[in-house]
UniProtKB/Swiss-Prot annotation:
GO terms for molecular function: arginine decarboxylase activity; metal ion binding. The keyword Cell membrane does not apply. This is Biosynthetic arginine decarboxylase. Its cofactor is Mg(2+); pyridoxal 5'-phosphate. Belongs to the Orn/Lys/Arg decarboxylase class-II family. SpeA subfamily. It comes from the Bacteria. Catalyzes the biosynthesis of agmatine from arginine. InterPro entries: Ala_racemase/Decarboxylase_C, Arg_decarb_HB, Arg_decarbox_C, Arg_decrbxlase, De-COase2_CS, De-COase2_N, De-COase2_pyr-phos_BS, Orn/DAP/Arg_de-COase. The keyword Disulfide bond does not apply. Keywords: Decarboxylase, Lyase, Magnesium, Metal-binding, Polyamine biosynthesis, Pyridoxal phosphate, Spermidine biosynthesis. Coiled coil: none annotated. Gene3D superfamilies: 1.10.287.3440, 1.20.58.930, Alanine racemase (3.20.20.10), Lyase, Ornithine Decarboxylase, Chain A, domain 1 (2.40.37.10).
Length: 630
C-alpha cells in the first residue's frame, strides 16, 4: 500500500473545494492561510505554537483582516467586470449589514478598506444605528436603515442626514412611513425614503422562508400602492429614492435569485411609469458561501454559482429591463455580509481526550466457566465472515439484548456484562469493515460507522463559538491543522466541554453526502492535537451564548506582509469573573463570602491556616482566569 500523501488529505477534507484559494496544505502537512493574492502564507500550526509561547491558550479565534480586504476587492472587481460587459451606466454600492458580525475591529477594517469601493453600512436596529453613525465617518458612503423603527430611531437618522450623512430609511411597515413623514416635517428635512417590497419569489436553502409571501418584512403590492398615495398626498413623492427586497440568506440556487431579480425589476419599471423616480435598487443579501465546497444546489451548505455569476445576473437583469423601458439604470446596492466575512475567521481548539467503544482483545480467551451468552457471542465473533455477517449481526443483537435484560434483573453480573459489551462491539466493528468493502451492503449496516465513531473531547463550547451548528445544523469545514501528511486512522464525533448532551458535532462535510464522523489521527502524548473550524466569520461570534458560563474565546488579529505574518492584536477571552458579572454575581462579594467561610473553617479546625490560604489563592486565580480549560 502506498504512503499517504498530502493530496490525499486535500481530497479527504475537500479543502480545495471550500478553501477558495485562502486555505491549503503545505509540505509539512500543516494547514496554511493565504490571505492575499501575493501568495504570502501563514502556517496555522506554527502560528498556534507561537501564540502558546505568548500564553494565548486555545480555544482561540484567528481573524485575518487581509481576507476581509480581499473579499471586498473580489466583489468590487466582479461588479466592474459585469458593468463593462453589460454596459451598466450607474453605480454599485456594497453595503455591509453589521448584524453579520458587529465586532468593532471587523467593522472598522471593512470601513477602512472599503472607502475606495463605495462600501457603506446597514443597520437593522436602534443599537446598530448608533454604532453605524459613529464609526462610518465617510460622508459619501451610504447608510441603509432596515428593521423596525420608532420615533427616536427615525429622528436620529434624519438628524444625521441633515448633518450630511447619506442615510436611507427603508420602510418595513406602513406605520413607519407615517412616522417618517411626521418627524421629517418637524425637523424640516427631506428624507431619503426606501420601501421594502414583499416579493412572491423566495430563496432556497435554510432561510427560504425569509422571502416570499410568508416573509416577516416588506409591503405587499396593495400596501405599496397605499404608501405611494400617502407620499404623494404629503408631498414626499420625490423622497422615494430606493426599493429593497430580500429573499433570504445563503440562497443555494442561482435560478431563485434570477426569478426574484426579474420580479423586482418590474417594480422599478412600474414606479418610474407612475412618476416615482427611484434611483437605487437594493437587492439585499442572499449571496451564499460554499461551506462544503461541492458547488451544489442540493446542499444547504453550498451554492451552485460564483460571485461573478451572481453579479452578472443582477446587473444584466436591471440593465435589460431599464433599456427596454427607456429609463435610467438604477444604482445597485448589495447587502452581502456573509460572503464578505465568513472566510476571515478560523476557530482553533485542542482535543483533550478521546473515548472509544470497548473491544475484545484478540489474545483473550473465554474461561470454561464463562456465562453461556458470552460463549455464544464469542463463537459468533470467532467464526464471522462475509457469508454469515447478516445472520451474525441479528444473533449478536439478540444476545446483547438478552444479556442486558438479565443484568437488569440481577441474574448476570457486571463482569459478564462487560464481556458481552466488548464482544458485541468487536463484532460490530468487523461487520462494518466487511460491509465497507461491498458494493451493495445490507441497509441495516448503513449506520454502523456513525455508531462506532470515537468521541473526541475538545476544549471549546459549541454554544459560544458555533451556535449555528447547534441551532440550525449548519455544517462548517473542520479538519486537523497538522499531521496531514499522515493517514487519519480514526473516525470521531466532536464533543465540547459544556455539561450538555447537545454540545457535540456529528455532521461533517463530505464530497458525497453529509458524513457523520470526522477522519482524525490518534492522539500523541508528546504533542497537542489541534482541530480548526473554518468559515466562521459570519454570525457565529455575535450569536454565541454563555451556556455553562463559557465566555468569549481569545481572539487574535493576524496580518501578512512581504516578510511573513504579523500578530497585530491579541484580545483576551473573558474571565470567570467577567461572565459571573453578566449574570449578576459580584466577584468581590464572592471573594469576601469565601474569606468569611474559610476563616470560620480554620477556627473550627476543619482545615489548617495554610490550607485556607491555598484555597483562597486558587479561588482568586481561577476567578480571574480563562473560562476554558487551561
Amino acid at each position: 500500500m502506498r504512503k499517504w500523501r498530502i493530496e490525499d488529505s486535500e481530497e479527504l477534507y475537500n479543502i480545495t473545494g471550500w478553501g477558495t484559494s485562502y486555505f491549503s496544505i503545505n509540505d509539512a502537512g500543516h494547514v496554511v492561510v493565504t490571505p492575499r493574492r501575493d501568495g504570502v502564507t501563514v502556517d496555522l500550526k506554527e502560528l498556534v505554537d507561537e501564540l502558546q509561547l505568548r500564553d494565548v491558550a486555545s480555544p482561540m479565534l484567528l481573524r485575518f483582516p487581509d481576507i476581509l480586504d480581499n473579499r471586498i476587492e473580489k466583489m468590487s472587481s466582479c461588479f466592474k467586470q459585469a458593468a463593462e460587459e453589460y454596459g451598466y451606466k450607474a453605480e454599485n454600492f456594497i453595503i455591509y449589514p453589521i448584524k453579520v458580525n458587529q465586532m468593532r475591529p471587523v467593522v472598522e477594517e471593512i470601513i477602512s478598506h472599503g472607502k475606495k469601493f463605495n462600501l457603506g453600512l446597514e443597520a437593522g436596529s436602534k443599537p446598530e444605528l448608533h454604532a453605524v453613525i459613529a464609526v462610518n465617518t465617510d460622508s459619501d458612503s451610504l447608510i441603509v436603515c432596515n428593521g423596525y423603527k420608532d420615533e427616536s430611531y427615525i429622528e436620529l437618522a434624519l438628524l444625521a442626514q441633515k448633518m450630511g450623512k447619506r442615510i436611507f430609511l427603508v420602510v418595513e411597515k406602513m406605520n413607519e412611513l407615517k412616522l417618517i413623514a411626521k418627524m421629517a416635517k418637524q425637523l424640516n428635512v427631506q428624507p431619503n425614503i426606501g420601501i421594502r417590497i414583499k416579493l412572491a419569489s423566495s430563496g432556497s436553502g435554510k432561510w427560504e422562508e425569509s422571502g416570499g409571501d410568508a416573509s416577516k418584512f416588506g409591503l405587499t403590492s396593495s400596501e405599496l400602492l397605499e404608501a405611494l398615495d400617502f407620499m404623494e398626498s404629503k408631498g414626499l413623492k420625490d423622497c422615494l429614492k430606493l426599493i429593497h427586497f430580500h429573499i433570504g440568506s445563503q440562497v443555494t440556487k442561482i435560478r431563485r435569485i434570477k426569478t426574484a431579480l426579474r420580479e423586482a425589476s418590474q417594480f422599478y419599471v412600474q414606479l418610474h411609469s407612475m412618476g416615482f423616480n427611484v434611483e437605487f435598487v437594493d437587492i439585499g443579501g442572499g449571496l451564499g458561501v460554499d461551506y462544503d465546497g461541492t458547488r451544489s444546489s442540493n446542499s444547504e451548505g453550498s451554492v451552485n454559482y460564483s460571485i461573478q455569476e451572481y453579479v452578472n445576473d443582477s446587473i444584466s437583469t436591471l440593465v435589460d429591463v431599464s433599456d427596454k423601458n427607456g429609463i435610467p439604470h438604477p444604482n445597485i446596492i448589495t447587502e452581502s455580509g456573509r460572503a464578505l466575512t465568513a472566510h476571515h475567521s478560523v476557530l482553533i481548539f485542542e482535543v483533550l481526550e478521546t473515548a472509544t467503544l470497548p473491544e475484545w482483545d484478540d489474545e483473550e480467551e473465554i474461561a470454561p466457566d464463562a456465562h453461556e451468552l458470552v460463549q455464544e457471542l464469542y463463537s459468533i465473533w470467532d467464526s464471522l465472515n462475509q457469508n454469515k455477517m447478516l445472520e451474525a449481526w441479528h444473533d449478536a443483537q439478540q444476545i446483547r439484548e438478552e444479556a442486558l435484560d438479565l443484568f437488569s434483573h440481577g441474574i448476570v453480573d457486571l463482569k459478564t456484562r462487560a464481556q458481552i459489551e466488548r464482544l458485541y462491539w468487536s463484532i460490530t466493528r468487523e461487520i462494518n469493515q466487511i460491509a465497507g468493502g461491498l458494493k451493495h451492503a445490507p441497509d441495516e449496516f448503513r449506520g454502523l460507522s456513525k455508531l462506532l465513531a470515537d468521541k473526541y473531547f475538545c476544549n471549546f463550547s459549541l454554544f459560544q463559538s458555533l451556535p449555528d451548528s447547534w441551532a440550525i445544523d449548519q455544517i462548517f469545514p473542520i479538519m486537523p491543522i497538522q499531521r496531514l501528511d499522515e493517514k487519519p486512522e480514526r473516525s470521531a464525533t466532536l464533543q465540547d466541554i459544556t455539561c450538555d448532551s447537545d454540545g457535540k458535532i456529528a455532521n461533517f462535510i463530505s464530497t458525497r453526502n453529509v458524513a457523520h464522523y470526522l477522519p482524525v489521527h490518534s492522539l500523541k502524548k508528546t504533542e497537542p492535537y489541534y482541530l480548526a473550524v473554518f468559515l466562521v466569520g459570519a454570525y457565529q461570534e455575535i450569536l454565541g451564548d454563555m451556556h455553562n458560563l463559557f465566555g468569549d474565546t481569545n481572539a487574535v488579529h493576524v496580518s501578512v506582509n512581504e516578510k511573513g505574518y504579523n500578530i497585530e492584536q491579541i484580545i483576551d477571552g473573558e474571565t470567570v469573573a467577567e461572565v459571573l458579572d453578566y449574570v449578576q454575581y459580584n466577584p468581590k462579594k464572592l471573594v469576601r463570602t469565601l474569606e468569611t467561610w474559610v476563616t470560620k473553617s480554620v477556627k473550627e479546625g476543619k482545615i489548617s491556616l495554610e490550607e485556607g490560604k491555598e484555597f483562597l489563592s486558587n479561588y482568586r486565580s481561577g476567578l480571574y482566569g480563562y473560562t476554558y480549560l487551561e
